[in-house]
C-alpha cells in the first residue's frame, strides 16, 4: 500500500524525484542502542531494553507540555530531573527518557524507571543538539 501511495504522489508531482518522495514516506525507526551511540550517551538504566525501537521524539522541560502536546511518542528528551518525568513517560507509553546537559536522575527516579521498564539515557549535549542529532538520523517529532 505504501509503495502504491508514493508512486501515486510521484506521478502527481512529476517535478519531484521519486526517490525523494519515497524517502519522505518512509517510516524510520531507531533502536535505543543506536540513539545511545549517536548521542554519545550512557545508559543509566535499561541496557536490556537497548533493542527496542523508537520512531518519534518529543522534548520539553515542562511535563504539562508533554502531557498536552505529545502525540505519538517513543522517546522523551528533557533536562528536568524529578519523578514526574518517569510518571509522565509511563502515562504516554514512552520507552526511553534521555536526560540532557549532563543532568543525572537520582536513585529514586532510576528505581521508578526500573519498575516501569523505561530505558534511561544521559548525554552531555544540549537539548537542541540532541534533537538535531536524532533528526539527522531520521527520527521526527511526535507532536
Please name every model-derived segment.
Residues 27, 38, 57-59:
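Short amphipathic alpha-helical surface micro-motifs
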Residues 51-52, 56, 60-75, 79-143:
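Feature captures the catalytic cores and cofactor-binding loops of soluble hydro-lyases/lyases
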Residues 11-29:
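Short, Lys/Arg-enriched N-terminal segments with co-localized hydrophobic residues
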Residues 1-3, 16:
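Methionine residue identity
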Residues 29-46:
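N-terminal, charge-rich interaction modules
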Amino acid at each position: 500500500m505504501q509503495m502504491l501511495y508514493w508512486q501515486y504522489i510521484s506521478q502527481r508531482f512529476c517535478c519531484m524525484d521519486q526517490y525523494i518522495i519515497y524517502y519522505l514516506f518512509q517510516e524510520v525507526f531507531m533502536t535505543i542502542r543506536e540513539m545511545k551511540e549517536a548521542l554519545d550517551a550512557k545508559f543509566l538504566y535499561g541496557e536490556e531494553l537497548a533493542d527496542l525501537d523508537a520512531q518519534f521524539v518529543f522534548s520539553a522541560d515542562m511535563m504539562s507540555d508533554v502531557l498536552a502536546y505529545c502525540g505519538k511518542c517513543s522517546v522523551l528528551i528533557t533536562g528536568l530531573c524529578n519523578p514526574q518525568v518517569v510518571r509522565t513517560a509511563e502515562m504516554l507509553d514512552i520507552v526511553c527518557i534521555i536526560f540532557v546537559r549532563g543532568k543525572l536522575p537520582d536513585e529514586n527516579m532510576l528505581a521508578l524507571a526500573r519498575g516501569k521498564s523505561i530505558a534511561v539515557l544521559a548525554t552531555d549535549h544540549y537539548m537542541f543538539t540532541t534533537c538535531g542529532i536524532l533528526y539527522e538520523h531520521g527520527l521526527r517529532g511526535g507532536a
